[in-house]
């Protein structure tokens, strides 16, 4: 039981003084709670207890191989990072394998990068032109596969060289994402 905490519950309501009971590593009760006989009690000293924060534009992933505790993030209360920004991403299969083989102390979600799709469909040496219709179809197919494997969707970085020549490919990809029935 953690008593005397300033609870922010994530619902948007004002913080409040409360207690939180944890049983079997899960929150079981929240409120004005009294301790059970022989229950371990921690005085929260009025400190804030809040749900973990989500860093929706993170570049921490590369450092997690050297620091799986993710201390730069977890020390800030971040429990989930979202990667795949700026148009670049790892394939979902690679990401899943990496996280299975090298577990980290933080949740990781990913977008699929637009420039990554362009590179896979067009070849890295061909990025300095607009995509051909058959390459656009490949990009949509790759994006659909990645979303079925857990990608959050499409992310761009149009200010980066690999995306300078995108035009229809970006529009086509965003149309797919918005009309997609991928869960």
Each predicted region: which residue ranges?
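Divalent-metal coordination cores built from histidine and acidic residues
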Residues: 44-49, 53, 58, 66-156, ...
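Histidine-rich, glycine-flanked metal-binding segment
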Residues: 7-52
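Conserved N-terminal strand/loop that marks the beginning of ABC ATPase nucleotide-binding domains
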Residues: 1-5
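Active-site core of metal-dependent hydrolases
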Residues: 154-183
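Active-site-adjacent substrate/metal-binding segments within catalytic domains
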Residues: 62
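Flexible loop residues that form catalytic
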Residues: 10, 86, 159
